[in-house]
Amino acid sequence: MKRSVHSRNWKDVVNKYCLLLLVFILSSCSKDEETPLPEQPGSGVSSFNFTALKVNDVFNGYSYYGLNDKPVFKVSFSNPIDRTSVPVSVKLSDATGQAIPVSISYLQGDSTLSATPITALKPLGKYFFDVQTNIKSTAGKYLSAPITVNFITALDPGDKFPRLSDEQLLDLVQKQTFKYFWDFGHPVSGMARERNTAGNTVTTGGTGFGVMAIVTAVNRDFITRQQGAARVRQIVDFLKKADRYHGAFSHWMDGNSGETIPFSLKDNGGDLVETALLMQGLLTAKQYFNAENATEKSIAKDIQALYESVEWDWYTKNGNSLFWHWSPEYQWDMNLPIKGWNEALITYVLAAASPMHSISKSVYDQGWAGNGAIRNGNTYFNQVLPLGSSSGGPLFFAQYSFLGLNPNGLKDAYADYGTQVKSHALIQYEYAKANPKAYYGYGENCWGLTASDDINGYLTHEINNDNGVVSPTAALSSFPYTPAESMKALRFFYYQLGDKIWGKYGFTDAFSLHHAWFADSTLAIDQGPMIIMIENYRSQLLWKLFMSNQEVKTGLRKLGFSSPNI
């Protein structure tokens, strides 16, 4: 019993000491938790805030366009700033992350800092101005959140090249752009490469444009008639051996073999619209190369044979519309009827004009015009648009079919085509002047939206799908419709932007002053219309040649068109 009492007393002592030890430990932990930790930048603990931002004394959000070369950034805070923290927390950098020295001054008792680059920034450069969270107040507090301003500097308005007369400038643009088709033409086939990086991929419609460019070049004495005829002869010989599908060519071909290169999975056969654009060019060349010599006679004969072999009527599927594609592997799976309004009017004209495989007027009325559904009639930017979608769509709709077809005085039951194409171009011009999306650079000198290369690949640019990218071909291929407006654009593109977009094949495909982005690419389907339509503006050469073809006249009359040229 004594043993048990003694044991109990010992346990009480131990428990007492354990309890005291536990109280000590807990009290120690409590004291540690109450000790303030060092403040972390931007943690929100005892932080301070920025209260105002101005760029050149204006606040317009956190993105700016067209800034001068020494912009002033003023940032105001809720507390005075510790100046020693500024060098590591306030930064100006370019798009590569390279730091740019800035001059700092302080206002309002150090609660506002003003920063400006020490040296002038480059024109059309992308830059970032940052105030990071490691900036401190004089009370030792850190900024609660970072500030980032992205901006693009303004265009240098000075001329990049010596001034020329307008006629000299037009000569230069045509001659330089022609090099795409002449110097860069495929060495085996003579066909136009799809783009400047295309290798052996040649384009059917683009070659039609290239053939019309060759005619222009001969007429302008850029090359001799013999040289031009030889190149057309080379192209025709290649086409005679190339893959065809009921007479129609594929969109793309291998420039060595003539074999089809699929444009997409099921688009690996005949493309009727591309074929029509090719034939427009070939028939123009046939009218031009008409001398009584063996070479030019053979060119005319073989072009006629190629045209007559196209089974336009077969591409109706025995119905009342032409269809865009047919594939020997996928048959009619693409199932894309050719219906207006778009670039494909020439397809129906040449189909109706065919001496061997003609279509009826009902195919045109129902398939293309939708029995009148093609009409628009609405007004956009004070311009009445007879046909098509809202605001007209991309400008190539007003250009591709009218490289050969003269729209002036051309009318049918649905539209006056001279009005259609001029209104479409003027709508885009007026849109750029109004600039409802406030894209930097847009205006009377910088306009034109069409399908082209884009910042993120390729895009069909138009008023309803505008991301600030301008394509020179849009305004310059509108020369016959808007000569004064197109000349303004040409002067601007060449003199003010020439250091960015002028190269060995003329103007590059697209640019955006708003995003300080400039394509380095050139495409056959964009280079060709510029040469051709500038020539139609200057002399109507291609219009006169194409419209002089008797089969074209017959086809137009068959579809119900009237024109002083038929």
Predicted regions and their residues:
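N-terminal secretory signal peptides that target proteins for export/translocation
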Residues: M1-V13
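C-terminal motif of bacterial Sec signal peptides marking the signal peptidase cleavage site
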Residues: I25-S28
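Ser/Thr/Asn(+Pro)-rich, low-complexity disordered segments
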Residues: D156-I566
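Acidic, low-complexity Ser/Thr/Gly/Pro-rich repeat segments typical of extracellular/periplasmic
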Residues: E33-G158
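Sec-dependent signal peptide recognition
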Residues: N15-L20
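Structured core of small recognition/catalytic domains
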Residues: V14, P38-P41, Q108-S111, G208-N219
